[in-house]
């Protein structure tokens, strides 16, 4: 069928002319059915499996390629599944002889899919033959509207296989899927970075191929995906050269359009095959440039063979991305906790357990708000894996079609704030729980949270605290806060208690955000056993700026506060300063916490507390008796102290 034939001729284009020519299809130099070009490209004629252009050397995908020599029936609309590649997406490209060239492996690359319908772009050539310098697979041409060229084939393993060309970016389509790995030849060049898809989804920037194991150059870091979803920049694995170790290229950050953040590639640790140079510390993962940026995962510093691993730079805070701070698990680039740049242990692993990348920008409020409005106890699923499916979150929102319009159903993001306590979208779940990683002790976590799941029903609706109101235990998170305070308090040793034990002084703490206050409150409780702290509550509104109407006296704002009762004024001052100093070093909501000292002329008579009986007989006692005591109603003035 002449080379030029439209390829619809009787032959199903499967290379029938050469089919038999040998399992590799090496036969077909020359004509080799041009038919292919429309194979998976939109027009469904299942013609040639292979996008070969007229003389494309291998007619890409020629020959039986299904090793059994059997031709498959002609119309094979899908490119998937055939054993042999037949080009649909050009997968089989290159089976044919390379022009006149090496048999078998060395097929030429399918010269990209024609600019025809959105077809599979030309397949990547399977790299040059193992000859001295097999050419690199040509870059897959970009399908005009179509899929992107699957990146250049891997360069042949020849003496210096060229690098696979970068995948062309699909003009409107998917992105080029990254350059092939450079051949393992003497000095395989680095695979070119995958081109970013121009529009549409961004290319996952190709990981730069690992440099050949020869004098390998480091793989160039994957290019950043262009706008669109951000491509995760591939981390170039440095070639383990005989000589210097390639420093892993830092993964390019996906330039987030509105994209998710590119996870900064972890810099590869230079391997240093012979312990050549020490691997330069892994480059820090590039920050995800924020669109609604996710947190760039701080690159794990590679352990160089001597050079200290570079610290993963914290993912840059995108607009709303989490990043902040260097790796490690603390407040570092590790888990984006979301909400404006405060990185952090959040839900944990790199960018991980917590926002599950989904919409990390307000990850906390969103995805989790959903989780909660959902009415099933599971605010963050305990196990990372469960998230996507079990949490039901994504799937479970849509089904009830337009529901959001009728009325704020818990799940609908729009109504987050109704559910979740205020425009800043923090769920009303215990703020403690909010950003805690899976808490270690149920001491306070939402009693219904994941950990409650086993307990049948919710024990009592959400208790921010575990056992009795307000007996929160300790756990690593609050311990850290407490530790910070203890250090600051250690600066001055002053009396914290008095003989009379009257609560005459106080520290009034407010502002920041509910969550930051809650955490600080739990921290103070651990650091200063001598104090007594009220639950978190809300401030009323103050004055309206203009002459207009003023708020009612009872009108609550969403700004929270709590009061710390103390027995000495001097310690109140010390504690105030400590809190101020602790808070100012922290990121956003926290640094806005304000503190002021109060003094109570006659002291506040806090109701007496009788420790519960040991046998547990009267374990309710502590509640019980202060109830009977009548105390709490009227501050228990009946002769407390």
Curated annotation (Swiss-Prot):
Site annotation Required for episome maintenance: residues: 518
GO terms (BP aspect): positive regulation of DNA-templated transcription; regulation of DNA replication; symbiont-mediated suppression of host NF-kappaB cascade; viral latency
Region of interest called Nuclear localization signal, as start-end residue ranges on this chain: 379-386
Biased composition (Low complexity): 383-394
Annotated spans, DBD/DD: 452-607
Renumbered residue ranges of the record's region Chromosome-tethering GR2: 328-378
Ranges of compositional bias, category Acidic residues: 620-641
Changes after translation: Phosphorylation at Ser-385 increases the nuclear import efficiency of EBNA1.
Domain of life: Viruses
Pfam family, one: EBV-NA1
Gene3D superfamilies: Epstein Barr virus nuclear antigen-1, DNA-binding domain (3.30.70.390)
Transmembrane segments: none
GO CC aspect terms: host cell nucleus
Record PTM Phosphoserine, positions in chain: 385, 393
Its EC number(s): 3.1.21.-
Family: Belongs to the herpesviridae EBNA1 family.
Known partners and oligomeric status: Homodimer. Dimers can assemble into higher-order oligomers like a homohexamer. Binding to the DS element involves 2 dimers of EBNA1. Interacts with human USP7; this interaction is independent and simultaneous to EBNA1 interaction with CSNK2B as well as necessary for PML nuclear bodies disruption by EBNA1. Interacts with host CSNK2B (via KSSR motif); the interaction requires phosphorylation of EBNA1, is independent and simultaneous to EBNA1 interaction with USP7 as well as necessary for PML nuclear bodies disruption by EBNA1. EBNA1, USP7 and CSNK2B form a ternary complex.
Extra remark beyond the main annotation: EBNA1 is possibly linked to multiple sclerosis in the host. Antibodies that recognize both EBNA1 and the host protein HEPACAM/GlialCAM can be produced when B cells undergo somatic hypermutations. A mimicry has also been proposed between ANO2 (Anoctamin 2) and EBNA1.
The protein's name in its UniProt record: Epstein-Barr nuclear antigen 1
Organism this protein belongs to: Epstein-Barr virus (strain GD1) (HHV-4)
Gene: EBNA1
